[in-house]
């Protein structure tokens, strides 16, 4: 009877183990029915409910009973030997369940669990083994945030030289500015993006000019109050941050420790490094511009070695200065090529609407123009083989490489001109004169006549066309139309490749502005004739002292105001009187030529310099 009592618990456990092994081969529903039947059978074979309960409560007694039963059954039948393996698993399961408490809980946990000795061929459909294995598999780790510096090449160029950042009391923006691109954020999570600037070391620096290097000058100054720049778009979703370039261009640096504008406070002559912080919203409750960045699992900091800079109140390295001027769009005023020029011309040309469209014409490279004070000028003027009489030495001779010049007779106030035949073909490139059948030399005697007759040119245009060199010609063609009398004189000069126009100054008809005995203030009229039919004029006054001396006017005035095609006053240089095209006269006022629009014009006694602009 005692053996039966001792063996009954183990037999019950072996039956349970056998039921467990069957569970791996049959469906869950059939296995549950089989378990119920075997439970009823086990309760009938048991001696009493008290002994069964005691065995189930005391895991140690059950273990010893089970093990003793296994030892006594040294030579069991083959079926019993086959069940020995599940019996060991049962014992192991009861050891684990013994610490849990009641027998029912242990039994349920054992029945619902998966046996490690299940068939190696795999469990069939509906087996709980795969279902229990799925929750145990590790989930893929979320992608870590990543920050990329934008404009890294420019930062590296500055870093190679030694980046410097200006700091002021009012605050100065950084250049280059911190611009980053963030990836790896949760699109649906809210984030703060912030930036602070921390010291690189505890040293103070100075710049050595002869070696162009920064050297340690001592220990750093006392720490400044911490400041954090929170991006204005914070907080925002990860999707918003990842689809844009995050710029900190509005961040300002200051050396004012009492600053209340939210600027980053730094010491001058110290090295600092910016840091970009990515902070989850649930971790950014303590985020403040005047407090350090909170630390925690949801806070990530990123820094870049090429963004290290030295704070200065004025740039020390000239290479840094030039690089910032060249690359900073807000420093374009320092890139003006004319910033070192002086005078009115630099001031006028700094504005686009004041700039003239054409340059002043000079005759420095034309060998036919005589120089003042030259003793051999008479020989140059008195050429042979020309239609120009020697009695008029003011006219140029037909040298092989000279260009036409236009003058007025000294006693007639008439326009004198040379025919293109007087100027032979020149070997200089670009100087091509078109010969016309109507020669201007035929009109020379009429121009030098003392009578005050009106010169009417032929209907066909008889002007000289010049290809590229700065030779000038006069437009003599005209059409029928009403003529009018003009108190000033104008010439129509044409230069190939430029707008055909002549600008010069003529005194007013009230009197000779160059007379020595004139005491009142005279006025000068500036004309520009745009061939064929556009006339512009401006009037400006001169002082009596300058009017008394024509040489003084020419020598003292380095420039005069002239008209531009847009109608504005421009600053142009005045040539010496003998280097320009002159209009000379000493006689009375005479009508001397017709133009297409001016008709009959009169010329007062004067000496002026004409300039092409």
Swiss-Prot record:
The protein's organism comes out as Mus musculus (Mouse)
What is reported when this gene is inactivated? Deficient mice fail to maintain anterior-posterior polarity, resulting in abnormal dorsal-ventral polarity of the somites. Mutant mice display neonatal lethality and abnormal morphology of vertebrae, ribs, spinal nerves and coronary vessels. Besides, mutant mice develop anomalies of the urinary tract, including hydroureter and hydronephrosis.
Q: Which residues bind DNA?
A: 149-336
GO MF annotations in UniProt: DNA-binding transcription repressor activity, RNA polymerase II-specific; protein homodimerization activity; RNA polymerase II cis-regulatory region sequence-specific DNA binding; RNA polymerase II-specific DNA-binding transcription factor binding
For this UniProt record, give its keywords in alphabetical order, as a comma-separated list.
Developmental protein, DNA-binding, Nucleus, Repressor, Transcription, Transcription regulation
Its function, per the record, reads: Acts as a transcriptional repressor involved in developmental processes of a variety of tissues and organs, including the heart, the coronary vessels, the ureter, and the vertebral column. Required for embryonic development of the sino atrial node (SAN) head area.
Motif Nuclear localization signal residues?
A: 36-40
Assembly mode: Homodimer. Can form a heterodimer with TBX15. Interacts with GATA4 and NKX2-5. Interacts (via engrailed homology 1 repressor motif) with TLE3; this interaction represses TBX18 transcriptional activity. Interacts with PAX3. Interacts with SIX1.
Q: Which SUPFAM superfamilies does the entry mention?
A: p53-like transcription factors
UniProt lists compositionally biased (Low complexity) regions at: 114-132
Instruction: Give the protein's recorded name.
Output: T-box transcription factor TBX18
Q: Which GO terms describe its biological process?
A: anatomical structure formation involved in morphogenesis; anterior/posterior axis specification; cell differentiation; cochlea morphogenesis; epithelial cell proliferation; mesenchymal cell proliferation; mesenchymal cell proliferation involved in ureter development; morphogenesis of embryonic epithelium
Top-rank taxon, per record: Eukaryota
């Amino acid at each position: 009877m005692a053996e039966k009592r001792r063996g009954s618990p183990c037999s019950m456990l072996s039956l349970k183990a056998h039921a467990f092994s069957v569970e791996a081969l049959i469906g869950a529903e059939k296995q549950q029915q089989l378990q119920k039947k075997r439970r009823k059978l086990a309760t009938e074979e048991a001696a009493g409910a008290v002994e069964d309960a005691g065995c189930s409560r005391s895991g140690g007694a059950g273990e010893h009973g089970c093990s003793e039963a296994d030892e006594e059954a040294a030579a069991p039948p083959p079926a019993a030997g086959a069940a020995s393996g599940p019996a060991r698993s049962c014992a192991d399961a009861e050891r684990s369940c013994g610490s849990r408490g009641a027998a029912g809980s242990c039994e349920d946990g054992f029945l619902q669990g998966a046996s490690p000795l299940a068939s190696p061929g795999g469990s069939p459909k509906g087996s709980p083994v795969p279902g229990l294995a799925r929750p145990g598999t590790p989930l893929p780790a979320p992608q870590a945030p990543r920050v990329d510096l934008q404009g890294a090449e420019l930062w590296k160029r500055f870093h190679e030289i030694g980046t410097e950042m200006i700091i002021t009391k009012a605050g100065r923006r950084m250049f280059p500015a911190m611009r980053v691109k963030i990836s790896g954020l949760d699109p649906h999570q809210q984030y703060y993006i912030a930036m602070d600037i921390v010291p690189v070391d505890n040293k103070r620096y100075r710049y050595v000019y002869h070696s162009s290097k920064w050297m340690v000058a001592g220990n750093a100054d006392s720490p400044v109050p911490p400041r954090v720049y929170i991006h204005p778009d914070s907080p925002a979703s990860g999707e918003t941050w990842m689809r844009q370039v995050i710029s900190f261009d509005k961040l300002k640096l200051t050396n004012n420790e009492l600053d209340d504008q939210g600027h980053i406070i730094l010491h001058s002559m110290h090295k600092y490094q910016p840091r970009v912080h990515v902070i989850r919203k649930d971790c950014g409750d303590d985020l403040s511009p005047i407090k350090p960045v909170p630390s925690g699992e949801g806070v990530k900091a990123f820094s870049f070695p090429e963004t290290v800079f030295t704070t200065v109140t004025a740039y020390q390295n000239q290479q840094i200065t030039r690089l910032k001027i060249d690359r900073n769009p807000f420093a374009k005023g320092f890139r003006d090529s004319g910033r070192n020029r002086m005078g009115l011309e630099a001031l006028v040309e700094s504005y686009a609407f004041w700039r003239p469209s054409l340059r002043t014409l000079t005759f420095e490279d034309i060998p036919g123009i005589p120089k003042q004070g030259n003793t051999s000028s008479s020989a140059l003027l008195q050429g042979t083989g020309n239609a120009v009489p020697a009695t008029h030495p003011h006219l140029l001779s037909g040298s092989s490489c000279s260009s036409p010049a236009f003058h007025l007779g000294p006693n007639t106030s008439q326009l004198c001109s040379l025919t293109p035949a007087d100027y032979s073909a020149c070997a200089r490139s670009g100087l091509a004169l078109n010969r016309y059948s109507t020669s201007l030399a035929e009109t020379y005697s009429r121009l030098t006549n003392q009578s005050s007759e009106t010169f009417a040119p032929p209907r066909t245009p008889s002007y000289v066309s010049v290809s590229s060199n700065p030779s000038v010609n006069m437009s003599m063609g005209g059409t029928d139309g009403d003529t009018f009398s003009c108190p000033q004189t104008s010439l129509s000069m044409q230069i190939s490749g430029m707008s055909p126009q002549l600008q010069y100054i003529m005194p007013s008809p009230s009197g000779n502005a160059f007379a020595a005995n004139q005491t009142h203030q005279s006025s000068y009229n500036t004309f520009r004739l745009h061939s064929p039919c556009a006339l512009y004029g401006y009037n400006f006054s001169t002082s009596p002292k300058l009017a008394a001396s024509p040489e003084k006017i020419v020598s003292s005035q380095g420039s005069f105001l002239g008209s531009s095609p847009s109608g504005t006053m421009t600053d142009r240089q005045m040539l010496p009187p003998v280097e320009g095209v002159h209009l000379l006269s000493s006689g009375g006022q005479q009508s001397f030529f017709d133009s297409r629009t001016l008709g009959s014009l009169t010329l007062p006694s004067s000496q002026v310099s004409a300039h092409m602009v």
